[in-house]
Amino acid sequence: MKAAVVTKDHRVSIEEKRLRELKPGEALVKTEYCGVCHTDLHVKNADFGDVTGVTLGHEGIGRVIEVADNVDSLKVGDRVSIAWMYAACGNCEYCTTGRETLCRDVLNAGYTVDGAMAEEVIVDANYAVKVPENLDPAAASSITCAGVTTYKAVKVSGIEPGQWLGVFGVGGLGNLALQYAKNVMGAKVVAFDINDDKLNFAKELGADAIINSTNVDPIEEVNRLTNNKGLDATVITAVAKTPFNQAVDVVKAGARVVAVGLPVDKMDLDIPRLVLDGIEVVGSLVGTRQDLREAFQFAAENKVIPKVQLRQLSEINDIFDEMEKGTITGRMVIDMKSSH
């Protein structure tokens, strides 16, 4: 079968791979679609360590074509996800308290185990979440990582109906965060970016305000919008240091700043302001299986509609080049069916 494999020179090669036999608790999935995530770029570039030889992909959607004898959670024909959280231990302090993404023994698709940029993929049957049949599978691929990541981040922000949430970076993740915040949580949303095309798209999606922080002072604009109160919370999906710092600067006392994007950098924090204004800065890592079920359902109800562009597996290096240049709007999704 064809698979997108990380090479030593930080590129991706389309290679023929043979899968092993299923082990107890596993299922075999024929991949339909796989989204391309910024984390895939980090993995390819060895930002988290050298994983040469691994098959990329953690935004996979496909149909189960075989299950191991002892599997009863899935059956042949089910449409399921192949997500970043491939499997966890199920027994640690994190797994038993609803924080399974923090499990120290977690396995990650497309990083520590082979992922979904392949014609077929082996999954842990207990961690492959079923996809609603009325949800377009190409759109579902974006929900599998980008969607659940931003949905969870918006939940972590604690935003309530009518409050102001700032979304920093409104590309593939940010435009989904905007939709979950506005259409599910009932928040008012300010979109921040330095790309006018992305900001205009955010406006089309319902952003209450858009701010290009290279043209105006974001603090002044937020003060104007909120009568000098500041935002109730911010979510950062951008992958640069500046928006992380700005996301702290524009919030009110008692606000929460949620970090999602993964720039290889450090934040500058004004410690007296954090203490005196009671500002919380927290990280949010993807989402649990239950978060993913909820994220899928809201998408199935058309409350969140990912903007996807279908590409071919052979274009994977071109997609990464575009990603590094910052020219992508929405989500790039590889049509794996065309490679079968």
From Swiss-Prot:
This is Alcohol dehydrogenase. Belongs to the zinc-containing alcohol dehydrogenase family. GO terms for molecular function: alcohol dehydrogenase (NAD+) activity; zinc ion binding. It comes from Staphylococcus epidermidis (strain ATCC 35984 / DSM 28319 / BCRC 17069 / CCUG 31568 / BM 3577 / RP62A). Disulfide bonds: none annotated. Zn(2+) 1 binds at C37, H58, C145. It comes from the Bacteria. Its cofactor is Zn(2+). The lineage of its organism: Bacteria, Bacillati, Bacillota, Bacilli, Bacillales. The keyword Repeat does not apply. Binds 2 Zn(2+) ions per subunit. It catalyses: a primary alcohol + NAD(+) = an aldehyde + NADH + H(+); a secondary alcohol + NAD(+) = a ketone + NADH + H(+). Its EC number is 1.1.1.1. SUPFAM superfamilies: GroES-like (SSF50129), NAD(P)-binding Rossmann-fold domains (SSF51735). Transmembrane segments: none annotated. Gene3D superfamilies: Medium-chain alcohol dehydrogenases, catalytic domain, NAD(P)-binding Rossmann-like Domain. Keywords: Metal-binding, NAD, Oxidoreductase, Zinc.
